[in-house]
Amino acid sequence: MIESQVCIVGGGPAGMMLGYLLGRAGIDTCVLEKHADFLRDFRGDTVHPSTMQIMHELGLLQDFLQLPHSEIDQLRAEIGGRSVRIADFRHIPAACRYIAFMPQWDFLNFLAEKARRFSALRILMQTQVTALIEERGRVVGVEATTPGGALQVRAGLVIGCDGRSSAVRQAAGLKVQDLGSPIDVLWFRVSRQPGDPGQVLGRLGRDTMLITIDRSSYWQCAFVIAKGAIGQVHASGIEAFRRTVAGAADFLAGRVHELQSFDDLKLLSVSVDRLTTWCKPGLLCIGDCAHAMSPVGGVGINLAIQDAVATANLLAGKLQRGALTDRDLELVQQRRLFPVKVIQRMQVAVQDRVLKPAVSGAMRDLTPPWFLQLLDHSAWLRRWPAQLIGLGVRPEHVRSPGPV
């Protein structure tokens, strides 16, 4: 058995950042991650200026930017073959005025490496939580399995950071509000060549939507399909899928043969939801565990990081003093619910009004809507979506205690 002041379930962006911040504050914390490493492909890899600002405030940015990554300081989309400029990050008030693309495993390994210098923090890999321990209506720990057998972790506070398929929130019986999603996403990779066009994030055709992310030696691609349509894609065969991809991005036509079979594709079943209540006595949920986000805008990592920073800001001092109450847990939801609602509302609008018509073949007019045409023609207006996308709604800053 392990005893800890705080037990964080899940070593994703929210869990690792919160573990770092609590360990930095000298709070006895353990992070439980079910996998042996962070090497999961086709996870979110969009690092927004808001996240790099947090790295800057923690004194980690210089080392962080030594990791392999690519950068874009403007967002462009292609609609019916026409390139449209949407956002310009070069004027936002942040340490980094661009979006970085970095494999999530590099991001998490970096945080884990930096966090291990804090003696108050333990990171336990290959530790899968199977149940919550409750006594007299209060969560007091978790049960887990490890390669060495069963493990019990007792903690004054358990924090669920285990993502959209959270075992913690299911075990806790917390109510989920499903906002719906009409899409799923197929992730795959295709090699990149020197003569390829520059970064155009989205390519919208009459019945296709393809996202292409530059990962230096290859393109990480996301092909949007209608919710539940994976069976139809399989029935049509891999050759038909290759032709569709080539039609969506003609510069990939000579390389789609690299998709040998459907084993080269990974399905992301998109959901947009949030818990009606993020906590119960002894338990708090943050990140995707509290609010599953659509891939629209690539904001998942960054909202999770913002949740972690807000949680540390609100709770770390009280944890240091041994003065944390169950009412304090409610402050996290009160702080973070408004930004989550705003972003989810925007994501649902894009899904319903743009992506659903596109993938269902209902989009007849591929002329960019008037507001996108306005953005394309006004450099000043492009600063506003950059501010919203890059920094988010009511961005957090590090105010939790430093090393003790």
Region locations from a protein language model:
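Beta1/beta-strand and adjacent pyrophosphate-binding region of the FAD-binding site
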Residues: 2-12
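N-terminal Rossmann-fold NAD(P) dinucleotide-binding loop
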Residues: 15-16
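Glycine-rich FAD pyrophosphate-binding loop
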Residues: 23-43
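Active-site-adjacent segment of FAD-dependent monooxygenases/related oxidoreductases
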Residues: 48-114
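A conserved beta-strand/loop element that lines the FAD pocket in flavoprotein oxidoreductases
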Residues: 116-129
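Conserved FAD-binding catalytic core of PHBH/FMO-like flavoproteins
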Residues: 127, 137-151, 157-270, 274, ...
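Short FAD-binding loop at a beta-strand-to-alpha-helix junction that anchors the flavin cofactor
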Residues: 279-295
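C-terminal helical "tail/cap" subdomain of flavin- and related membrane-associated enzymes
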Residues: 313-404
